């Protein structure tokens, strides 16, 4: 990623960001407008914390130690745009409900799953999905199911390892290489794996630049 790319990303993510809408079902989705970048992952993988780190606002996306807390598609955009034609924000970040939380009531899990899958399959303004993988656990069966769905729907996605501060630093490059090997034959996977720590701020600048590049391509 070029210096210009990183400067553009810093400009976008350096603005104040705001929460605009929680979407409990597809009928409540906002009108299609700005490019959407979504974050998917197992419950408690750190989606909300990563979004907060990206925009430099610890309290923007609500975080919780309780798995399954995010139950809607939560939309965030940079402030200062009217949202009208000709004055749309450059992108919207979408915090998706976590999957794989077995302790939630079945009806709730089914509703979350339907919302996530319907959104991934049917949103034309969705440019890329960042699938977050806990560095301590690697890719699980639930993750593979989501990757297969994204492959089938031809939705571009990129793997982001989270919580890398929780493993030995020397093990991060090896984990990145192993993860890349697992996804290299998947048709919709972007051929680069990013590593991040929201707590330490590691990898955040690279992720911002990757998002900016995905939006502007």
Curated annotation (Swiss-Prot):
Instruction: Specify one Pfam family.
Output: MMR_HSR1
InterPro entries noted in UniProt: G_ENGB_dom (IPR030393), GTP-bd (IPR006073), GTP-bd_ribosome_bio_YsxC (IPR019987), P-loop_NTPase (IPR027417)
CC cofactor: Mg(2+)
Statement: the UniProt record of this protein carries the keyword Cell cycle: yes
Q: Which CDD domains match?
A: YihA_EngB
Briefly, what is this protein's role? Answer: Necessary for normal cell division and for the maintenance of normal septation.
User: Would you tell me the protein name for this molecule?
Assistant: Probable GTP-binding protein EngB
Question: Which source organism does the UniProt entry give?
Answer: Rhizobium meliloti (strain 1021)
The organism's lineage is: Bacteria, Pseudomonadati, Pseudomonadota, Alphaproteobacteria, Hyphomicrobiales
Q: Which gene encodes it?
A: engB
């Amino acid at each position: 990623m070029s210096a210009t790319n990183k400067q553009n990303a810093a400009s976008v993510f350096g603005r104040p960001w705001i929460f605009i809408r929680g979407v409990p079902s597809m009928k409540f989705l906002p009108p299609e407008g700005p490019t959407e970048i979504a974050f998917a992952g197992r419950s408690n993988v750190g989606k909300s914390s990563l979004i907060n780190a990206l925009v430099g606002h610890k309290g923007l996306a609500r975080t919780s130690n309780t798995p399954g807390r995010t139950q809607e598609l939560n939309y965030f955009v940079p402030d200062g745009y009217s949202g009208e034609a000709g004055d749309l924000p450059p992108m919207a970040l979408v915090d998706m409900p976590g999957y794989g939380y077995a302790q939630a009531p079945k009806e709730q899990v089914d509703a979350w799953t339907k919302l996530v899958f319907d959104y991934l399959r049917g949103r034309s303004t969705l440019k890329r999905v960042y699938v977050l993988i806990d560095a301590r656990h690697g890719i699980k069966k639930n993750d593979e199911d989501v990757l297969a769905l994204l492959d089938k729907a031809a939705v571009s996605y990129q793997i982001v390892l989270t919580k890398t501060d929780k493993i030995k630093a020397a093990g991060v490059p090896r984990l990145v290489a192993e993860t890349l090997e697992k996804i290299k034959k998947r048709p919709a996977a972007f051929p680069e794996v990013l590593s991040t720590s929201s707590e330490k701020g590691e990898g955040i600048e690279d992720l911002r630049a990757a998002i900016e590049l995905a939006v502007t391509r």
